[in-house]
Amino acid sequence: MADVRTKKILTFIELMLTSFSPKVKGTTLIYAIFYGITCHLTFAIAVIAMIYHMFYGMQKSFGNFEGTLAIVANGALIIQFPLIHSFLLSKRGQKLLNFLGPKNVARSLATTSFTIIASMQLLFLFMFWSPSKIVYEMPYEFLGYILPILYFISWILLIIATIDAGLEVQSGALGWVSVLANRKPIFPPLPKKGLYSMIRHPIYASFFLAVITVPSWTADQLVVSLILGAYCIFAPILKDRRLMKRYGDEYLKYKNITPYMIPVKNIKNT
């Protein structure tokens, strides 16, 4: 399976490097390159910000509100992500994404626009959170050694799940690469291999593990873990519906034989 993932990564890199069409010129070329750079830069910074700030229990964030203002500001930051994220994945949200950007390529750039917005949402959440400075002591000393390892493993699983799902979609590259290649975006086949052969939603499951295995537990992190953890559990219900519409009977068959987020079938068979 490692060879398959390596091939996917190399194919993804090749796709970005060889997708240029001579027919794409002028402002369209500039838009494609600008969206691509913006997308991957904000995505990378957002991921680093998530890993770093949750590692320290949100105590290194740069928000400076206190008291009631901190509660209101932090509440807005934590709620905006699941609400806007879910809306943009809905039918109405997709229509809005189709209008965000230059008129002639906005629809093709929709997946890239979505990734840029999601990355900015995460950046705002993790960079501008106002720390409460309420830190909880670990009940057992050994947790201080185990949790960082589990946290690291969770992020590795998330990276693997992202590769298995298809880097072109998950990274937002599908949109700008399609514009650069002068073709309509073509979504990859339904992922069924790797972690997707065990559960239907390994990305959500991996991120759930990340938010509950943070090495530093604070009042702030508790709130973040509760809200984002709940989102990871319930958001895949809506994703099941979207995938059912996109893939039809193929997804129904896959859904009937593959567990939601816990590999119960695999556990029973071992």
Where are these regions (language model features)?
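Hydrophobic transmembrane alpha-helices
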Residues: T42-Y52, N64, T68, A76-I78, ...
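Hydrophobic alpha-helical transmembrane segments of multi-pass integral membrane proteins
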Residues: C39-M50, G75-L83, T112-F126, Y151-W155
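Membrane-interface helix termini and inter-helical loops of multi-pass transporters
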Residues: F55-F65, L96-L100, W129-E141
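Short, Lys/Arg-rich, polar N-terminal cytosolic tail immediately upstream
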Residues: M1-T28
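Membrane-helix interface/capping segments
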Residues: I84-K103
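Alpha-helical transmembrane segments
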Residues: E66-Q80, L143-I160
